[in-house]
Regions:
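Active-site Gly/Thr loop motif
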Residues: 112-116, 160-213
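Flexible glycine/proline-enriched surface loops and loop-helix/loop-strand junctions
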Residues: 43, 65-71, 81-83, 121-128, ...
Length: 242
């Protein structure tokens, strides 16, 4: 389905023609700069505009963006599109992300601690691309939920279709065979991960029945050296399991 069917603000705009699947896979084709060190990049500017009534910051910013590629033909990471997924969920369910997460996952899965989710100052909608604050152990429990393919006893919290698309290699994005599924990074060994800036990570390896969660405060949004050290740690854990 096209985004304009769920987000009226996008009617008549390029983003209105983008499908939900294309947003979930970062293949909208919309021009976007995710350079965290460039103060003029899209990711740096997307929350800077003054509020327009109760419209979410990200909608105000992204309404004006235009296609750089035909939808579905080009992969490009965009934090803005993770925000759009959050808005889609809130508009479709009539609930905040925090309420929906609590109802569908946090309480049924027996999370140990309370968590909170930052809200957009203009719309009061939770921000899908960032702002979920939870304990390390509960992040690891989210990974365990993915490892169990969303199953809680005889019930499934996630649909089988979602799990398959989340952990599958839908788009190859590097020469090493790694790629992207539904908002998860897929590695060439079948493992997959949710990776945030400043060192946040949730790593799931079904073949080794392994979940690794990391909360960090790296000095830069992305660090090649620290990423390599983290990968060395993951490799070491896998060797011990073997």
């Amino acid at each position: 389905d096209a985004l304009e069917n769920y987000i009226p603000e996008f009617k008549g705009q390029d983003y209105g023609k983008v499908t939900v699947r294309q947003v979930l896979t970062m293949t909208s084709g919309i021009a976007w700069n995710e350079d965290y060190e460039d103060v003029n990049s899209d990711v740096a500017q997307m929350y800077q505009a003054p509020c327009q009534d109760t419209e979410a910051h990200i909608l105000t910013y992204m309404k004006s963006l235009r296609f750089a590629h035909a939808p579905g033909t080009h992969w490009n990471y965009s934090t803005g599109e993770t925000d759009l997924v959050g808005i889609l969920i809130q508009k479709a369910t009539g609930k905040s992300l925090a309420e929906y997460l609590s109802e569908k996952i946090w309480k049924p899965w027996g999370m140990e601690h309370c968590a909170y989710w930052l809200a957009d100052e203009c719309s009061n909608l939770n921000i899908g691309g960032s702002g979920l604050s939870a304990s390390l152990r509960d992040y690891a429990r989210l990974g365990t939920l993915m490892l169990k393919e969303g199953k809680l006893g005889d019930e499934s919290i996630f649909s089988e279709e979602y799990i398959d698309n989340a952990k599958s290699l839908l788009y190859e994005v590097n020469d090493e065979g790694g790629g992207y599924g539904y908002l998860w990074w897929r590695n060439n060994n079948g493992s997959y991960a949710a990776v945030g800036i400043f060192g946040q990570m949730l790593y799931v390896d079904p073949a080794k029945n392994l979940v690794i969660a990391q909360i960090a405060a790296w000095p830069k949004a992305g660090s090649k050296e620290l990423t390599q050290r983290r990968q060395a740690f993951i490799d070491a854990v896998q060797r011990v399991i073997d």
